Amino acid sequence: VRKRWLLFSLLGGLAVLALTLSGHTPGHTPGGADRPLRPPPAGLYGWDWQIGATDETQVGMPSGIRLIDLDAFGTSAATVARLKAAGLYTVCYINAGSYEPYRPDAARYPARLKLGVDPNWTDEAFVDVRDVFRPRSVLAEVLKDRLRLCRDKGFEAVEPDNLQNDENVPGGVITLQDQVDFSGWLADAAHALGLAIFQKNGPDKVLLRDRTGRRLADKFDGILNESCQRYDECAPLAEYVRRGKPALNVEYDQKFLDCAGARRLGVNSMFKDKYLVGRREAAYRRVACEPRP
């Protein structure tokens, strides 16, 4: 499930134009060498998720947070720098497993990649994640360029959405192993650019091995989950905690927020408004579990 708005399309287009004018082209790494990876903070702490902010002027910093997650296309390098200067760890949202028609790179997705309509977002389509392993893969190049966009804006980590196409695409076209292999590929691609990366949802997959033989909980640098308390699936998130990595969770119905239970597992859980808007917007809601009771 993703929560973000169409107005990011215009902002994203301007960002792509700016990168082009500054000499960035798809497939090019500015400066040649990539930076060292900085992992996200471990342990219990406050964080926020504002990927649905109408625009970046609506983004704000709640007191006491250490990490913030924002949209790749809708957030400027200047905003990222400001947040980092304030001491925040910055995470970059991209949609890895779906086609979104309003993104500035949407024209790069051929029809053959689109396997099924997302019932929650009917203008979108789940993509064929197997494509990244094919020669001259279109999807691999699109996603690598999105990762470069995150890196070039100064983000330290990435949140890739829709890593459950084995469940989302009808007819069993994408197998469980196909999906796990794709997730592992994303982790490797992010790390190659000096970006940390969160597993998005799929707590049942944390101990599965990709084609390199490594478990997802060993490859990813943390996990960001939605509604694990509502669906009683938080326990697997503790695999990340045991590895010294952060586990983040959001509930969209406050009655399911169980702070004592989250703390026992080492999970950073909070209640958020459904559309994850910016802190300065009227619809913004956030009730976070305190790191200590």
For the regions a language model picked out, list residue spans one by one:
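N-terminal Sec-pathway targeting helices
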Residues: V1-L10
